[in-house]
UniProtKB/Swiss-Prot annotation:
GO terms for molecular function: 2-C-methyl-D-erythritol 2,4-cyclodiphosphate synthase activity; metal ion binding. A divalent metal cation binds at D10, H12, H46. Its EC number is 4.6.1.12. Disulfide bonds: none annotated. This is 2-C-methyl-D-erythritol 2,4-cyclodiphosphate synthase. Binds 1 divalent metal cation per subunit.
């Protein structure tokens, strides 16, 4: 069994005049703030996207969906996450599970976690039981604690699709070289 783990992290500044979307769910910030970014700035989905791409050794969100590309301006991060999942599957892996944490002083997120889990599971094409979202505050510390930013972290577990031999192109070359069959 070939298991791989990826880690993702993202942070976006809170500013007036922007929507606040976390985990594919639009929320209201008590101070009327939203997240600044090229896309919809969904900090949680960006962290999960990075974790998945990293687990499959496919780089990061900036490589696949650069903020210099107008095609991704105001993009729905659920679509970016779905495309990242498609690329992970194309590389020969299936998604095992996602564990994630959002760190925000406000708004309170606990009541929104079921909707976030559902939105993430739908974007990934997995069962909701494969997705976990936790919410924490920064206890008033740092930029997150001062309502200047929201941060998210994620871990993704992926496993090779049976029969796909998903060890990645570089590892396949090394394996071939070791077995004497050349690169």
């Amino acid at each position: 069994m070939n298991l791989r783990i990826g880690e993702g992290w993202d942070v976006h500044a809170l500013v007036p005049g922007r929507r606040l979307v976390i985990g594919g769910v639009e929320l209201e910030h008590p101070m009327g703030l939203g997240l600044l970014g090229h896309s919809d700035a969904d900090v949680l989905l960006h962290a999960i996207t990075d974790a998945l791409l990293g687990a499959a050794a496919l780089g990061d969100i900036g490589r696949h969906f650069p903020d210099t590309d107008a095609a991704f301006r105001a993009a729905d991060s659920r679509l970016l996450l779905a495309e990242a999942a498609r690329r992970v599957r194309a590389a020969g892996y299936e998604i095992g599970n996602i564990d994630s944490t959002v760190v925000a002083q406000a708004p309170r997120l606990a009541a929104h976690i079921p909707a976030m889990r559902l939105a993430i599971a739908r974007a990934l094409g997995v069962d909701q039981g494969q997705v976990n979202v936790k919410a924490k505050t920064a206890e008033g510390l740092g930029p997150v604690g001062q309502n200047l930013a929201i941060e998210a972290r994620a871990v993704a577990l992926i496993c090779a699709t049976p029969g796909a031999g998903a060890i990645g192109p570089a590892a396949q070359r090394v394996s071939s070289a070791w077995s004497g069959s050349g690169a």
